[in-house]
C-alpha cells in the first residue's frame, strides 16, 4: 500500500512539474513580447468565415519586435494540425490579402496565421513604415518559431505563403530555415531586384544606381535634421490619365472599398522614402538555388511583375521560362491564364488557385 501511495505521489509530482514548466515557458514567451493594443472587432476587407475560429495572437522575432497576427483554426479540429504562416503584399496589412489566404486555407484544414510585418500594421517596431530584407525575412522565421510551439500544431508540418513583395521574403526564408517544409510565393515581387534595377532593368546602370544612393543619402540627412521620416506616398490618388494599367489595378484595390484599410501603408501615405534603402545592397535570392524543400510560384499571365517569379524559378532550377507553367523537381511555376498582378490579391477575379495550394501543402506537409 505504501509503495502504491509513493508511486501516486511521484506521478502527481511529475505532472505538476510538467505543468509548471509549460506555464513557465508560456510566461517566458509573454515576457519577451510587448503588449500590443489589438483591435478585437472584425475589420477585414473580406467576410468572416463560419467554418473557422479566429483570434488575435502575438509573437516576437529575434530583434525584439512583437508581431501581431490573426490566427485561423478549422472549427472542430482535433489533434496536431499542419500550419501555415502568411504575409504580404508589401505595404499591406493582415486584414487584406494575407488574411484572406489564411482564412481560405484554414477552411481546408490548416491552422494558419496572417501577420503584420515589423514596423507595420498592429505590429511593433520604430520607425513605422520601414522595411528590411533581413528583418522581414526574420518575421517569417519568427512565425515558424511561434507555430512550432503551439500544442495543436505539428512542428514537422509547417509551411509559408508570401504575397507580392513578401513572396520574395518567403523564398529567402525557405533558403534559410529547413523547418519550413513547403513555400508558396503568390504574385511575387523581388524587392531587391526592383529597388536596384528598377522595373524591367530600366534603372540598371552604375550611374543610375549612384543617383539613387545620393538621393537616399540626402533624404537621410534631411530626415535627421527634421526629426521625422518623409513618407513616399501610397498608391497614387487621384489617378492621372496616363497612369500605367497596373497602377490603375493597384488603385482599384487599395484605394476603394474593395481593399482599402486604414492601417495599410499602400492605402494611405506609404513607406518612408528611405524605408527600402537596404534592399539595394542585399539581394534576396542569393541562395535560392540551395532550397531543398518544395516551392510553388504562382503568377498571373498578364501581370507586369511576372518576370520576378520567372527569375526566382530560374535561380532555383537553372531553367529559363517565359510565360508558361513549368515544374522541375520539387520547384513549380504556375502561370494563371489572363490574370493580372492584383487579380491574385483577392477573390474578385476568382483566379486564386486555392485547390492547387491545398493540394501542394497536403502533399508536402505530411
Model-derived segments and their meaning:
Residues 34-79:
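N-terminal cap/lid segment of alpha/beta-hydrolase-fold proteins
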Residues 79-89:
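Short beta-strand element of the alpha/beta-hydrolase
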Residues 91-103, 117:
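The serine-hydrolase catalytic nucleophile loop
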Residues 94, 120-155, 159, 347-353:
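Catalytic nucleophile-loop/oxyanion-hole region of alpha/beta-hydrolase
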Residues 104-124:
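Conserved alpha/beta-hydrolase
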Residues 171-255:
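Alpha/beta-hydrolase-fold enzymes
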Residues 291, 297-299:
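Short beta-strand/loop motif that positions the catalytic acidic residue
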Residues 337-366:
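Catalytic active-site module of serine/aspartate enzymes centered on a nucleophile-bearing elbow/loop
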Amino acid at each position: 500500500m505504501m509503495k502504491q501511495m509513493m508511486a501516486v505521489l511521484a506521478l502527481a509530482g511529475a505532472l505538476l512539474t510538467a505543468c509548471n514548466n509549460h506555464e513557465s515557458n508560456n510566461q517566458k514567451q509573454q515576457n519577451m513580447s510587448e503588449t500590443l493594443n489589438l483591435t478585437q472587432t472584425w475589420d477585414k476587407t473580406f467576410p468572416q468565415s463560419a467554418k473557422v475560429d479566429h483570434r488575435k495572437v502575438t509573437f516576437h522575432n529575434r530583434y525584439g519586435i512583437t508581431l501581431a497576427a490573426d490566427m485561423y483554426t478549422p472549427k472542430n479540429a482535433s489533434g496536431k494540425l499542419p500550419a501555415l504562416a502568411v504575409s504580404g503584399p508589401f505595404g499591406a496589412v493582415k486584414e487584406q490579402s494575407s488574411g484572406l489566404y489564411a482564412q481560405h486555407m484554414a477552411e481546408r484544414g490548416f491552422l494558419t496565421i496572417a501577420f503584420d510585418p515589423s514596423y507595420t500594421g498592429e505590429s511593433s517596431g520604430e520607425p513605422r513604415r520601414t522595411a528590411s530584407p533581413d528583418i522581414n525575412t526574420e518575421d517569417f522565421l519568427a512565425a515558424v518559431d511561434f507555430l512550432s510551439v503551439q500544442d495543436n500544431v505539428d512542428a514537422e508540418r509547417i509551411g509559408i505563403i508570401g504575397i507580392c513583395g513578401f513572396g520574395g521574403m518567403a523564398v529567402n526564408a525557405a533558403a534559410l530555415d529547413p523547418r519550413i517544409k513547403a513555400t508558396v510565393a503568390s504574385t511575387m515581387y523581388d524587392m531587391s531586384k526592383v529597388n536596384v534595377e528598377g522595373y524591367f532593368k530600366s534603372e540598371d546602370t552604375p550611374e543610375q544606381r549612384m543617383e539613387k544612393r545620393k538621393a537616399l543619402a540626402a533624404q537621410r540627412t534631411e530626415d535627421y535634421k527634421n526629426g521625422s521620416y518623409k513618407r513616399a506616398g501610397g498608391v497614387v490618388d487621384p489617378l492621372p490619365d496616363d497612369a500605367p494599367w497596373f497602377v490603375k489595378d493597384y488603385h482599384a484595390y487599395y484605394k476603394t472599398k474593395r481593399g482599402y484599410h486604414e492601417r495599410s501603408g499602400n492605402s494611405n501615405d506609404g513607406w518612408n522614402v528611405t524605408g527600402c534603402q537596404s534592399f539595394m545592397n542585399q539581394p534576396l535570392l542569393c541562395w535560392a538555388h540551395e532550397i531543398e524543400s518544395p516551392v510553388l510560384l504562382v503568377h498571373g499571365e498578364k501581370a507586369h511583375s511576372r518576370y520576378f517569379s520567372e527569375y526566382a524559378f530560374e535561380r532555383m532550377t537553372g531553367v529559363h521560362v517565359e510565360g508558361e507553367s513549368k515544374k522541375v523537381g520539387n520547384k513549380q511555376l504556375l502561370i494563371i491564364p489572363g490574370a493580372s498582378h492584383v487579380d491574385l490579391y483577392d477573390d474578385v477575379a476568382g483566379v486564386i488557385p486555392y485547390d492547387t495550394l491545398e493540394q501542394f501543402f497536403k502533399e508536402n506537409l505530411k
